Amino acid sequence: MRLNTLSPAEGSKHASKRPGRGIGSGLGKTGGRGHKGQKSRSGGGVRRGFEGGQMPLYRRLPKFGFTSRKSMVTAEIRLSDLAHVEGDVVDLNTLKAANIVGIQTEFAKIMLSGEVKRAVTIRGLRVSKGARAAIEAAGGKIEE
């Protein structure tokens, strides 16, 4: 057996329909598009959300909410990321130096994901309950 002799089992593959290629194809002449009308034309059809001129649902319903600008400059940090920080004190500047958060970041919160292997002091960062328990269990402390 060679790669160039491999072929699928007889009858396991069906030839795809080729619209507009004659009466015998089952999709000849109009190619399954019917006669005339917008949807029969090339490039025809209406845009997403168009309801034939009726005021569409997305315009009938009111706008709501907004995206907080604070969320754009807030980062979530995993416990396992703390291993990449040099030194025993972790604050926003040491996280930026270790490339864990971006330069634009102004706030950060440490979440319980992974585990902390050594005692670290967290300074000026928010910490979730689970992460706080894990840090203190490893001998670390949190300074507000």
Curated annotation (Swiss-Prot):
SUPFAM superfamilies: Ribosomal proteins L15p and L18e
The name this protein goes by in its record: Large ribosomal subunit protein uL15
Protein's GO biological process: translation
Subunit composition and interactions: Part of the 50S ribosomal subunit.
Keywords assigned by UniProt, alphabetized: Ribonucleoprotein, Ribosomal protein, RNA-binding, rRNA-binding
GO cellular component: cytosolic large ribosomal subunit
Function: Binds to the 23S rRNA.
Keyword Ribonucleoprotein among record annotations: yes
Claim: rRNA-binding is one of the keywords in the record: yes
Stretches for region Disordered: 1-53
Bias (Gly residues) ranges: 21-31
GO molecular function, one term: structural constituent of ribosome
Annotated signal peptide: none
InterPro entries: Ribosomal_uL15, Ribosomal_uL15/eL18, Ribosomal_uL15/eL18_sf, Ribosomal_uL15_bac-type, Ribosomal_uL15_CS
Cited Gene3D superfamilies: 3.100.10.10
Similarity comment: family membership: Belongs to the universal ribosomal protein uL15 family.
PROSITE patterns: RIBOSOMAL_L15
